[in-house]
From Swiss-Prot:
Family: Belongs to the oxidase-dependent Fe transporter (OFeT) (TC 9.A.10.1) family.
Subcellular compartments: Cell inner membrane
Organism: Shigella flexneri serotype 5b (strain 8401)
Gene (name only): efeU
The organism's place on the tree of life at top rank: Bacteria
Protein's name in the database: Ferrous iron permease EfeU
Membrane topology: Multi-pass membrane protein
Subunit structure: Part of a ferrous iron transporter composed of EfeU, EfeO and EfeB.
Pfam families xref list: FTR1 (PF03239)
Record's keyword annotation contains Transmembrane helix: yes
Protein backbone atom coordinates (compact mmCIF):
# COMPACT_ATOMS: atom_id res chain seq x y z
CA UNK A 1 0.00 0.00 0.00
CA UNK A 2 1.41 3.40 -0.99
CA UNK A 3 1.73 6.29 1.42
CA UNK A 4 -1.09 8.12 -0.37
CA UNK A 5 -3.32 5.05 -0.10
CA UNK A 6 -2.56 4.82 3.61
CA UNK A 7 -3.28 8.54 3.97
CA UNK A 8 -6.64 8.12 2.24
CA UNK A 9 -7.48 5.11 4.41
CA UNK A 10 -6.50 6.92 7.61
CA UNK A 11 -8.55 9.94 6.52
CA UNK A 12 -11.58 7.74 5.99
CA UNK A 13 -11.15 6.08 9.40
CA UNK A 14 -10.72 9.47 11.08
CA UNK A 15 -13.82 10.91 9.42
CA UNK A 16 -15.89 7.83 10.22
CA UNK A 17 -14.80 7.80 13.86
CA UNK A 18 -15.30 11.55 14.23
CA UNK A 19 -18.95 11.36 13.22
CA UNK A 20 -19.64 9.22 16.26
CA UNK A 21 -18.56 12.09 18.53
CA UNK A 22 -21.18 14.50 17.15
CA UNK A 23 -24.63 14.99 18.70
CA UNK A 24 -27.33 13.23 16.70
CA UNK A 25 -28.54 16.22 14.66
CA UNK A 26 -25.01 17.39 13.89
CA UNK A 27 -24.08 13.86 12.89
CA UNK A 28 -27.03 13.66 10.49
CA UNK A 29 -26.04 17.05 9.05
CA UNK A 30 -22.48 15.85 8.56
CA UNK A 31 -23.70 12.67 6.86
CA UNK A 32 -25.90 14.72 4.53
CA UNK A 33 -23.01 17.00 3.60
CA UNK A 34 -20.75 14.00 2.95
CA UNK A 35 -23.44 12.48 0.73
CA UNK A 36 -23.74 15.72 -1.27
CA UNK A 37 -19.95 15.86 -1.71
CA UNK A 38 -19.98 12.24 -2.86
CA UNK A 39 -22.75 12.98 -5.39
CA UNK A 40 -20.78 15.92 -6.82
CA UNK A 41 -17.56 13.91 -7.07
CA UNK A 42 -19.23 10.87 -8.62
CA UNK A 43 -21.15 12.99 -11.14
CA UNK A 44 -17.98 14.82 -12.15
CA UNK A 45 -16.18 11.49 -12.50
CA UNK A 46 -18.94 10.08 -14.74
CA UNK A 47 -18.86 12.95 -17.20
CA UNK A 48 -15.07 13.04 -17.16
CA UNK A 49 -15.03 9.35 -18.09
CA UNK A 50 -17.60 10.02 -20.81
CA UNK A 51 -15.39 12.74 -22.23
CA UNK A 52 -12.19 10.68 -22.39
CA UNK A 53 -13.59 7.19 -23.03
CA UNK A 54 -13.48 7.39 -26.83
CA UNK A 55 -9.76 7.94 -27.22
CA UNK A 56 -8.38 7.17 -23.79
CA UNK A 57 -6.61 3.94 -24.81
CA UNK A 58 -4.80 5.50 -27.78
CA UNK A 59 -3.93 8.66 -25.86
CA UNK A 60 -2.53 6.71 -22.93
CA UNK A 61 -0.41 4.48 -25.15
CA UNK A 62 0.96 7.47 -27.06
CA UNK A 63 1.72 9.38 -23.86
CA UNK A 64 3.51 6.40 -22.32
CA UNK A 65 5.61 5.76 -25.42
CA UNK A 66 6.54 9.43 -25.70
CA UNK A 67 7.50 9.69 -22.01
CA UNK A 68 9.62 6.55 -22.03
CA UNK A 69 11.47 7.59 -25.18
CA UNK A 70 12.50 10.96 -23.74
CA UNK A 71 14.61 9.61 -20.91
CA UNK A 72 14.65 8.72 -17.24
CA UNK A 73 13.17 11.95 -15.86
CA UNK A 74 10.10 11.63 -18.04
CA UNK A 75 9.74 8.04 -16.89
CA UNK A 76 9.66 9.17 -13.27
CA UNK A 77 7.11 11.83 -14.22
CA UNK A 78 4.95 9.06 -15.65
CA UNK A 79 5.29 7.06 -12.44
CA UNK A 80 4.27 10.06 -10.34
CA UNK A 81 1.32 10.77 -12.63
CA UNK A 82 0.04 7.23 -12.08
CA UNK A 83 0.72 7.55 -8.35
CA UNK A 84 -1.34 10.71 -7.95
CA UNK A 85 -4.10 9.40 -10.23
CA UNK A 86 -4.48 6.33 -8.01
CA UNK A 87 -4.32 8.53 -4.88
CA UNK A 88 -7.10 10.72 -6.28
CA UNK A 89 -9.29 7.70 -6.95
CA UNK A 90 -8.55 6.49 -3.43
CA UNK A 91 -9.78 9.77 -1.98
CA UNK A 92 -12.94 9.57 -4.08
CA UNK A 93 -13.45 6.03 -2.81
CA UNK A 94 -13.15 7.25 0.79
CA UNK A 95 -16.03 9.70 0.32
CA UNK A 96 -18.08 7.16 -1.61
CA UNK A 97 -17.63 4.43 1.01
CA UNK A 98 -18.17 6.82 3.89
CA UNK A 99 -21.50 7.90 2.41
CA UNK A 100 -22.47 4.25 1.90
CA UNK A 101 -21.46 3.29 5.44
CA UNK A 102 -23.59 6.10 6.87
CA UNK A 103 -26.67 4.59 5.23
CA UNK A 104 -26.09 1.10 6.66
CA UNK A 105 -24.06 0.31 9.76
CA UNK A 106 -24.27 -3.45 9.25
CA UNK A 107 -21.61 -5.80 7.96
CA UNK A 108 -22.57 -5.61 4.28
CA UNK A 109 -20.99 -2.28 3.27
CA UNK A 110 -17.55 -3.18 4.73
CA UNK A 111 -17.85 -6.65 3.22
CA UNK A 112 -18.75 -5.13 -0.15
CA UNK A 113 -15.78 -2.76 0.10
CA UNK A 114 -13.41 -5.65 0.78
CA UNK A 115 -14.89 -7.71 -2.06
CA UNK A 116 -14.57 -4.72 -4.39
CA UNK A 117 -10.93 -4.25 -3.41
CA UNK A 118 -10.25 -7.95 -3.96
CA UNK A 119 -11.97 -7.78 -7.37
CA UNK A 120 -9.87 -4.76 -8.33
CA UNK A 121 -6.69 -6.65 -7.38
CA UNK A 122 -7.75 -9.67 -9.45
CA UNK A 123 -8.63 -7.53 -12.49
CA UNK A 124 -5.37 -5.61 -12.14
CA UNK A 125 -3.44 -8.87 -12.08
CA UNK A 126 -5.29 -10.19 -15.14
CA UNK A 127 -4.80 -6.94 -17.05
CA UNK A 128 -1.09 -6.76 -16.29
CA UNK A 129 -0.05 -10.41 -16.32
CA UNK A 130 -2.86 -12.20 -18.10
CA UNK A 131 -2.91 -9.98 -21.14
CA UNK A 132 -6.72 -9.74 -21.30
CA UNK A 133 -8.12 -6.94 -23.42
CA UNK A 134 -10.65 -4.50 -22.04
CA UNK A 135 -12.93 -2.35 -24.17
CA UNK A 136 -12.48 0.87 -22.21
CA UNK A 137 -15.28 2.67 -24.04
CA UNK A 138 -17.89 0.05 -23.14
CA UNK A 139 -16.42 -0.34 -19.65
CA UNK A 140 -16.67 3.39 -18.93
CA UNK A 141 -20.19 3.53 -20.37
CA UNK A 142 -21.68 0.81 -18.18
CA UNK A 143 -19.77 1.71 -15.03
CA UNK A 144 -20.84 5.33 -15.51
CA UNK A 145 -24.51 4.34 -15.67
CA UNK A 146 -24.02 2.26 -12.53
CA UNK A 147 -22.39 5.22 -10.75
CA UNK A 148 -25.26 7.55 -11.72
CA UNK A 149 -27.77 5.24 -10.03
CA UNK A 150 -25.50 5.04 -6.97
CA UNK A 151 -25.28 8.85 -6.89
CA UNK A 152 -29.07 9.14 -7.15
CA UNK A 153 -29.40 6.95 -4.07
CA UNK A 154 -26.86 9.10 -2.24
CA UNK A 155 -28.80 12.25 -3.19
CA UNK A 156 -31.99 10.75 -1.75
CA UNK A 157 -30.05 9.71 1.34
CA UNK A 158 -28.77 13.26 1.73
CA UNK A 159 -32.29 14.70 1.83
CA UNK A 160 -33.23 12.05 4.40
CA UNK A 161 -30.23 13.01 6.54
CA UNK A 162 -31.12 16.70 6.29
CA UNK A 163 -34.64 15.87 7.46
CA UNK A 164 -33.29 13.97 10.46
CA UNK A 165 -31.03 16.95 11.18
CA UNK A 166 -34.10 19.20 11.24
CA UNK A 167 -33.19 21.20 8.13
CA UNK A 168 -35.77 19.78 5.73
CA UNK A 169 -39.29 18.90 6.86
CA UNK A 170 -41.29 19.19 3.64
CA UNK A 171 -42.98 16.34 1.73
CA UNK A 172 -42.24 13.73 4.36
CA UNK A 173 -45.30 11.61 3.60
CA UNK A 174 -44.55 8.01 2.66
CA UNK A 175 -44.55 7.77 -1.14
CA UNK A 176 -45.02 3.98 -1.24
CA UNK A 177 -44.29 0.91 0.86
CA UNK A 178 -42.31 -1.89 -0.80
CA UNK A 179 -41.62 -3.85 2.39
CA UNK A 180 -43.91 -6.69 1.30
CA UNK A 181 -42.09 -6.98 -2.04
CA UNK A 182 -38.47 -6.17 -1.16
CA UNK A 183 -37.69 -5.68 2.50
CA UNK A 184 -34.43 -4.06 3.57
CA UNK A 185 -34.11 -6.92 6.06
CA UNK A 186 -33.73 -9.44 3.23
CA UNK A 187 -30.36 -10.25 1.69
CA UNK A 188 -31.12 -8.64 -1.67
CA UNK A 189 -32.83 -5.67 -0.02
CA UNK A 190 -29.81 -5.09 2.20
CA UNK A 191 -27.56 -5.29 -0.86
CA UNK A 192 -29.71 -2.78 -2.74
CA UNK A 193 -29.75 -0.48 0.28
CA UNK A 194 -25.98 -0.59 0.66
CA UNK A 195 -25.25 0.01 -3.04
CA UNK A 196 -28.12 2.15 -4.33
CA UNK A 197 -29.55 3.60 -1.11
CA UNK A 198 -32.80 1.66 -1.55
CA UNK A 199 -35.50 2.36 1.04
CA UNK A 200 -38.56 0.16 1.36
CA UNK A 201 -40.77 3.09 2.43
CA UNK A 202 -39.21 6.32 1.12
CA UNK A 203 -40.70 9.75 1.63
CA UNK A 204 -42.07 11.87 -1.20
CA UNK A 205 -39.06 14.19 -0.98
CA UNK A 206 -36.61 11.27 -1.27
CA UNK A 207 -38.35 9.92 -4.37
CA UNK A 208 -38.53 13.42 -5.86
CA UNK A 209 -34.83 14.10 -5.30
CA UNK A 210 -33.98 10.69 -6.77
CA UNK A 211 -35.83 11.48 -10.00
CA UNK A 212 -34.77 15.16 -10.07
CA UNK A 213 -31.13 14.07 -10.03
CA UNK A 214 -31.27 10.91 -12.11
CA UNK A 215 -33.42 11.96 -15.08
CA UNK A 216 -31.36 15.05 -16.07
CA UNK A 217 -28.14 13.11 -15.41
CA UNK A 218 -29.21 10.26 -17.69
CA UNK A 219 -30.38 12.68 -20.39
CA UNK A 220 -27.09 14.60 -20.24
CA UNK A 221 -25.15 11.33 -20.35
CA UNK A 222 -27.12 10.08 -23.37
CA UNK A 223 -26.63 13.28 -25.37
CA UNK A 224 -23.90 13.07 -28.02
CA UNK A 225 -20.66 14.96 -27.31
CA UNK A 226 -20.53 18.56 -28.43
CA UNK A 227 -19.24 19.12 -31.94
CA UNK A 228 -16.36 21.25 -30.70
CA UNK A 229 -15.22 18.63 -28.21
CA UNK A 230 -15.44 15.89 -30.84
CA UNK A 231 -13.46 17.93 -33.33
CA UNK A 232 -10.75 18.75 -30.80
CA UNK A 233 -10.31 15.07 -29.95
CA UNK A 234 -10.12 14.01 -33.58
CA UNK A 235 -7.64 16.76 -34.46
Amino acid sequence: MTSRSRQAAYSGIFINETTGEFPQKEQELFEGIVAVIAVVILTWMVFWMRKVSRNVKVQLEQAVDSALQRGNHHGWALVMMVFFAVAREGLESVFFLLAAFQQDVGIWPPLGAMLGLATAVVFGFLLYWGGIRLNLGAFFKWTSLFILFVAAGLAAGAIRAFHEAGLWNHFQEIAFDMSAVLSTHSLFGTLMEGIFGYQEAPSVSEVAVWFIYLIPALVAFALPPRAGATASRSA
